[in-house]
UniProtKB/Swiss-Prot annotation:
UniProt-listed Enzyme Commission number(s): 3.4.19.16
Protein name as catalogued: Gamma-glutamyl peptidase 1
Domain of life (superkingdom): Eukaryota
Function statement: Involved in glucosinolate biosynthesis. Hydrolyzes the gamma-glutamyl peptide bond of several glutathione (GSH) conjugates to produce Cys-Gly conjugates related to glucosinolates. The gamma-Glu-Cys-Gly-GSH conjugates are the sulfur-donating molecule in glucosinolate biosynthesis. Converts phenylacetohydroximoyl-GSH to benzylglucosinolate. Can use the GSH conjugate of the camalexin intermediate IAN (GS-IAN) as substrate. Required for the biosynthesis of camalexin, a pathogen-inducible phytoalexin with antibacterial and antifungal properties.
GO BP, one annotated term: proteolysis
Amino acid sequence: MVEQKRYALFLATLDSEFVKKTYGGYHNVFVTTFGDEGEHWDSFRVVSGEFPDEKDLEKYDGFVISGSSHDAFENDDWILKLCDIVKKIDEMKKKILGICFGHQIIARVRGGTVGRAKKGPELKLGDITIVKDAITPGSYFGNEIPDSIAIIKCHQDEVLVLPETAKVLAYSKNYEVEMYSIEDHLFCIQGHPEYNKEILFEIVDRVLALGYVKQEFADAAKATMENRGADRKLWETICKNFLKGRVPTN
C-alpha cells in the first residue's frame, strides 16, 4: 500500500467573502491548484496564530506559505513564530513553496532583506523573464524552459537583498527577484500561481472601494487581462513537480 502524501498550507491571509462564497475558502483555491487525488492537505491559519505542533512537522512531505496583506518584515508575534517554524522546516530540508509573502518570509529567514517595493505596488497580470542558465534542464521546470511566464501579481513589498545561497530564477522590468530557489528544497515566487482572473478582479474592486488605489490604477490592472490570461497550467505543473519531487518527461 502506497503511503499517503501529506502537505501543510500556511495561510497568512483571511478568506474574503468572495473567496468563501465562490471557492469555499483559500484552502480550496490552493489545494485545487497544487493538490492531487489521494493526498492529505492540512491548513493552518497562521495569521490568526494557528500553527502545527513542532513534533508534527516531520509527518509532512512539503509546505506552502501563502500571500498576505501583512508585511514580511513586520515583527508581529505570529510573523516571528512563522519565521521560527520556517527555520525549523528548512533545517529539516523539507520542501517549502513560498508565494508572495511566503517568498519574502523565506528570504528573511535565510538572511535576506525585505522591504517596500522600490518601483511601487503591482496589481496586474505580468510577464517574468526566466534566467535559463540558472535552471537545470530536467528539473521541475522540465526540459523545455520558457523564455517568460505570465503570472498574476499582487504585492507592495519585494525581496531587496537575496540570501547568499539563493539563486535568482526570474526577474521582470521593475523587480530583480521574481523567483528564486535555495538548494533543492526552497522554491519561491513573488507572483500568485494560484490566482485567476476572477480573484484578481475582486481584489481590484475591493481595494478601489476601500480607497487604497485610484480608478485609473484599477482600470489598468483589469486591462492587463483583457486579451490573455496567466500561464496557470504551466505554474501548476512546475509547482507540483517541485513539491512532489517529480521528474518531468517533456
